């Protein structure tokens, strides 16, 4: 399958022997599980029941944004009479059971994880999602024993595109940022990973096809296009 290399990526991106692949950090929604359409559908459903139709463009903009920020935006659209705590509780009550019931690995995930594990490359997860949502997905996919660390947006002060959640994931991975590759599917996520000093691969999905991935070292349409050797080549070579 074809891939697009982006000139804005780091030196050696997509070519050469590369340096040492020290770890891989996955985003969750849209990367390891196709949960973003379900999340946006749930939010739109909640707003509609309260008399507000959310535009597709707004839902598109909210992709990859922390749930706290999503609730702020939706709450503002619904008006002053909305209890933000009740809104969040309603979302959790609807979304988490649906997520547990429908979570399935994205194409290529299981093969990529098996290859990384076989090569001894540590893996972690950095997501704007809550710990409850992360637990629902990692439990459904059986990733609990695979990931060395998990970092949630609710554990940091600043959400993506700030680097905080990636810096926390790198810390829990047990490595410095050098040699670590992040896999993202949103412009905010790519910006966060790059700001944390990581090389980033962008997965262009149906939900994020219009996002600006100019900071990514590589753009693919599926995890099926990635393997250990390809990720290794993205790591800048030692000078």
Question: Where are these predicted regions, by residue range?
Answer:
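Asp-based, Mg2+/Mn2+-dependent phosphohydrolase catalytic module
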Residues: 1-22, 114-117, 130-239
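Active-site neighborhood of HAD-like aspartate-dependent phosphohydrolases
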Residues: 2-60
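Short beta->alpha linker loops
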Residues: 38, 62-66, 104-108, 129, ...
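Hydrophobic/aromatic residues within well-ordered alpha-helical segments
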Residues: 39, 63-67, 87-95, 130, ...
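Alpha-helical substrate-recognition element adjacent to the catalytic core
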Residues: 41-84, 107
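Metal-dependent phosphoesterase signature
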Residues: 53, 74-111, 119
């Amino acid at each position: 399958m074809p891939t697009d290399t982006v000139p804005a990526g780091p030196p050696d991106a997509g070519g050469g022997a590369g340096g040492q692949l020290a770890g891989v950090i996955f985003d969750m929604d849209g990367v390891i599980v196709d949960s973003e359409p379900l999340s946006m559908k749930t939010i739109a459903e909640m707003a509609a029941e309260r008399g507000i139709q959310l535009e597709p463009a707004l839902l598109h903009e909210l992709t990859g944004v922390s749930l706290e920020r999503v609730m702020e935006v939706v709450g503002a659209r619904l008006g002053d009479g909305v209890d933000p705590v009740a809104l969040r509780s309603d979302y959790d009550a609807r979304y988490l059971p649906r997520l547990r019931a429908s979570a399935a690995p994205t194409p290529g995930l299981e093969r990529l994880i098996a290859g990384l594990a076989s090569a001894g490359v540590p893996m972690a997860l950095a997501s704007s999602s809550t710990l409850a949502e992360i637990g629902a997905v990692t439990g459904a996919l059986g990733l609990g024993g695979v990931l060395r660390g998990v970092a949630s947006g609710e554990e940091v002060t600043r959400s993506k595109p700030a680097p905080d959640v990636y810096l926390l994931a790198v810390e829990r991975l047990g490595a410095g940022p050098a040699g670590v590759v992040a896999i993202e599917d949103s412009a905010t996520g790519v910006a966060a990973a790059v700001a944390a000093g990581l090389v980033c691969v962008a997965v262009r999905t149906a939900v994020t096809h219009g996002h600006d991935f100019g900071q990514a070292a590589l753009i693919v349409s599926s995890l099926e296009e990635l393997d250990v050797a390809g990720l290794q080549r993205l790591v800048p070579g030692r000078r």
